[in-house]
From Swiss-Prot:
Superkingdom per UniProt: Eukaryota
Keyword Transport: yes
Record protein name field: Guanine nucleotide exchange factor for Rab-3A
Family as reported in the entry's similarity comment: Belongs to the SEC2 family.
Keyword terms of this UniProt record: Coiled coil, Guanine-nucleotide releasing factor, Phosphoprotein, Protein transport, Transport
The keyword Transport is assigned to this record: yes
Length: 383
């Protein structure tokens, strides 16, 4: 039963049912149209009421959003710049470290190269010095052997000279010191001498082949020669240009070594000056024949220097050559005289002679006398 209040429609929302709407009892079609129009109006009024009770949210602040975005972008840019700066700084440090290591490497390579070069140079220098010392030692050894051979030959010649110059029974008339005391002097009161030839023979008629030599010889120093010798002795040298040796070469050495075979004579002279000449005695067995540049020397009966037919008891060898040349006693005496002179002046040059100037001068004069006598053909007899 209707009580005069409109009832709430269960199919409508609460808001619309709560709104009081006047109802009119119209026809069926007209009432339906009026009811639908009323519903639309009620819905519109409900929305307005809802709008008044709950207002719509305000629009977003665009400028604020833009500022936040800009701030974020700037912070990101600054962060990236810092990272880029750090990376560039690290890269620069690494480049500097690489450059420093490259310099160290180049310096080490240069030092290693210099050290290697210095080591090779030092090793080459040591090898060169060792070779020079070895060559010098070998040369000195050869010279020593040459001197030994020469001295042995001289000793042999001196022994031969002593043996041949000492008779088995000495002549007591020529050596008064060998006489007995009763016969040493003349008897008292004896005024006559026998005129027989036998008593005068020791003085007037010396034995054949023996020339008596005086017991004493007069000596006088030539001032020119002595001055030249003193000048040479102040600084001994083997240079032929100095006045002292130039005179000896011109007056003694040159003539003494001037043999018939000129080519071999020049070789002998060079070997004597270089101290490379060797004189060897000829063995009893047959020796191989040796040819001389200008004179054939097929046996020991021809002198290679003079070309004369002489019995050769010695032979010479020049330097390291294997060739031997047979020489006569006269040629050997001439070569030996020159070798004795050169040996003595070498001893003076080396400081081995400890004498005053005058004894040394007279020894040189004696050696020059030996060269002159050998050139003139005087030489000791061989055994």
């Amino acid at each position: 039963m209707w009580s005069g209040q409109p009832q709430q429609d269960e199919g409508l929302p609460v808001g619309l049912s709560a709104i009081p709407v006047p109802w009119k009892n119209l026809g069926p079609s007209k009432s339906n149209r009026e009811s639908s129009g009323g519903l639309v109006e009620a819905s519109t009024s409900w929305e307005e009421a809802q709008g008044e009770e709950h207002p719509a949210p305000a629009p977003l602040d665009v400028s604020r959003l833009r500022s936040s975005s800009m701030e974020i972008r700037e912070k990101g840019s600054e962060f990236l710049k810092e990272e880029l700066y750090k990376a560039q700084k690290e890269l620069k440090l690494k480049d500097e470290e690489c450059e420093r290591l490259c310099k160290v490497r180049a310096q080490l390579e240069q030092e290693l190269e210099e050290l290697t070069a210095s080591l090779f140079e030092e090793a080459h220098k040591m090898v060169r010095e060792a070779n020079m010392k070895q060559a010098t030692s070998e040369k000195q050894l050869k010279e020593a052997w040459g001197k030994i051979d020469m001295l042995q030959a001289e000793v042999t010649a001196l022994k031969t000279l002593v043996i041949t110059s000492t008779p088995a029974s000495p002549n007591r008339e020529l050596h008064p010191q060998l006489l007995s005391p009763t016969k040493a002097g003349p008897r008292k009161g004896h005024s006559r001498q026998k005129s027989t030839s036998s008593s005068l023979c020791p003085v007037v008629c010396p034995t054949a082949g023996h020339i008596p030599t005086p017991d004493k010889e007069g000596k006088e120093v030539d001032t020119t020669l002595f001055a030249e010798f003193q000048a040479w002795r102040a600084s001994p040298t083997l240079d032929k240009s100095c006045p002292f040796l130039e005179r000896v070469y011109r007056e003694d050495v040159g003539p003494c070594l001037d043999f018939t075979v000129q080519e071999l004579s020049a070789l002998v002279r060079t070997a004597v000056e270089d101290n490379t000449l060797t004189i060897e005695p000829v063995a009893s067995q047959t020796l191989p024949a040796v040819k001389v540049p200008t004179v054939e020397c097929n046996n020991t009966n021809t002198c290679a220097l003079s070309g004369l037919a002489r019995t050769c008891h010695h032979r010479i060898r020049l330097g390291d050559s294997d060739s031997h040349y047979y020489i006569s006693p006269s040629s050997r005496a001439r070569i030996t005289a020159v070798c004795n002179f050169f040996t003595y002046i070498r001893y003076i040059q080396q400081g081995l002679v400890r004498q005053d100037a005058e004894p040394m001068f007279w020894e040189i004069m004696r050696l020059r006398k030996g060269m002159s006598l050998a050139k003139l053909g005087f030489f000791p007899q061989e055994a």
